[in-house]
């Protein structure tokens, strides 16, 4: 009789341990499945935020002839958004640093973006401004000067700048999206 009680208690204890182990195992499996789903359905991604601004006065636009070998040619001024900085403050700062002009009330008019090989996104917020103060001056980014808007297509534009220019000029467009197709960069204007 005592033997049967010990055996029953021992089996009960074993069953409890097995039950708890099974619950932990099932919970762990469900947790792993949850994490896998969360990773594949992630709503966040790594993004580099930058800006570019078309500063204009009448039929003239301010251009920057970039000297950076990685991205050289005619563009508009702009640069990176710093951590904790508002987008508008960033474009005002960048235009000032690269041109000496302090723009007033820049208007967001579109975006340019693409996905890098590492899966991160690069996003350029596009602004327009026609009010500014200050004296025009060059920076280490390159020479800045006024050009006739109509002459821009004949100038040596930086890579993919012609599509971006269309977003600046056409109110029906809001995005210049670059993507890889069969190993070649393609462009989609939306």
Residue ranges and their predicted role:
Residues 128, 137-169, 186-189:
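NUDIX/MutT-family hydrolases
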Residues 102-110:
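A short coil-to-beta-strand element that immediately follows conserved catalytic motifs
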Residues 40-62, 77:
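Conserved N-terminal beta-strand and adjoining loop/helix that marks the start
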């Amino acid at each position: 009789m005592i033997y049967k009680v010990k055996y029953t208690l021992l089996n009960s204890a074993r069953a409890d341990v097995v039950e708890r182990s099974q619950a932990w195992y099932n919970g762990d499996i469900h947790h792993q499945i949850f994490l896998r789903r969360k990773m594949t359905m992630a709503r966040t991604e790594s993004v580099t935020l930058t800006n570019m601004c078309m500063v204009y006065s009448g039929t003239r636009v301010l251009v920057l002839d970039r000297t950076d070998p990685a991205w050289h040619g005619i563009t508009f001024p702009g640069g990176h958004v710093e951590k904790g900085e508002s987008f508008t403050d960033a474009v005002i700062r960048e235009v000032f640093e690269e041109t000496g002009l302090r723009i007033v009330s820049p208007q967001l008019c579109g975006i340019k973006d693409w996905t890098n090989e590492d899966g991160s996104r690069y996003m350029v917020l596009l602004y327009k401004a026609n009010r500014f103060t200050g004296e025009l001056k060059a920076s280490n980014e390159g020479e800045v000067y006024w050009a006739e808007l109509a002459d821009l297509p004949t100038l040596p534009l930086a890579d993919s700048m012609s599509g971006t220019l269309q977003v600046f000029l056409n109110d029906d467009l809001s995005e210049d999206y670059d993507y890889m197709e069969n190993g070649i960069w393609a462009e989609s204007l939306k």
